[in-house]
């Protein structure tokens, strides 16, 4: 059994008299430690998939298996525990607490889980060893995003879920952030899932899940993912 599996997953929304199908019979599998890109245009349903995998939303039908457990059967309390213990989130905007230092922002993880990584070492791992005591306003956009990644991985999550993580960053800074995410997968064993509309990022992934019109249109496996250093986008 794969580490993550979505099987015949559907998500529907009701808007007035209109039913919107956000996910239509979604099927895919992801292995532990892979860097996966979910690729598609706006409205393709990829963020809905990410929200369901992260326990921030629930599907209406089908299975969502994480490490052998079907989280689609979880109640609200079980989903909260799952989000707290097993999932790290990185978004396009950094969501840092402005009156806490970089180190204090990452230390928030230790208030959520019992086996959190050391905040200082985690920030060193993302290249911010000299910025531990800086506040978010004193950091560049790329540095703030690295703090948000450090905060997410400090929880030791089963899944690191990233929604357009470089969407607000310049080219060079975006590559630095992608390098960190690729290293988390390759060297730390993290299972990293990135949602993006940017098809140029596909070569860095172990697996690319293409979405179109609320469904998975194709899946490709890269036997030799491209190193970030050589990526042009």
Task: Walk through the language-model features, giving the residues of each.
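ABC family nucleotide-binding domain
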Residues: 2-211
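Conserved beta-strand-loop-alpha-helix hinge in the C-terminal portion
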Residues: 207, 215-233
């Amino acid at each position: 059994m794969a580490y993550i599996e979505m099987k015949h997953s559907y998500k529907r929304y009701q808007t007035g008299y209109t039913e919107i199908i956000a996910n239509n019979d979604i099927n895919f599998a992801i292995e532990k430690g892979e860097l996966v890109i979910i690729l598609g245009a706006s409205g393709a349903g990829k963020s809905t998939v990410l929200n369901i995998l992260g326990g921030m939303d629930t599907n209406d039908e089908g299975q969502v298996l994480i490490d052998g457990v079907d989280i689609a059967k979880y109640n609200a309390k079980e989903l909260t525990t799952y989000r707290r213990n097993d999932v790290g989130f990185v978004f396009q905007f950094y969501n840092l607490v402005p009156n806490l230092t970089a180190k204090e922002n990452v230390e928030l993880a230790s208030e959520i889980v019992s086996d959190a990584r050391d905040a200082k070492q985690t920030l060193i791992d993302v290249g911010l060893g000299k910025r531990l005591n800086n506040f978010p306003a004193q950091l560049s956009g790329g540095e703030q995003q690295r703090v948000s990644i450090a905060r997410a991985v400090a929880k030791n999550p089963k899944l690191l879920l990233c929604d357009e993580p470089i969407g607000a960053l310049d080219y060079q800074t975006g590559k630095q952030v992608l390098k960190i995410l690729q290293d988390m997968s390759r060297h730390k064993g993290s299972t990293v899932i990135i949602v993006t509309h940017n098809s140029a990022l596909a070569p860095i992934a172990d697996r690319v899940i293409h979405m179109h019109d609320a469904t998975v249109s194709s899946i490709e496996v890269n036997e030799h993912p491209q190193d970030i250093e050589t990526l042009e986008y």
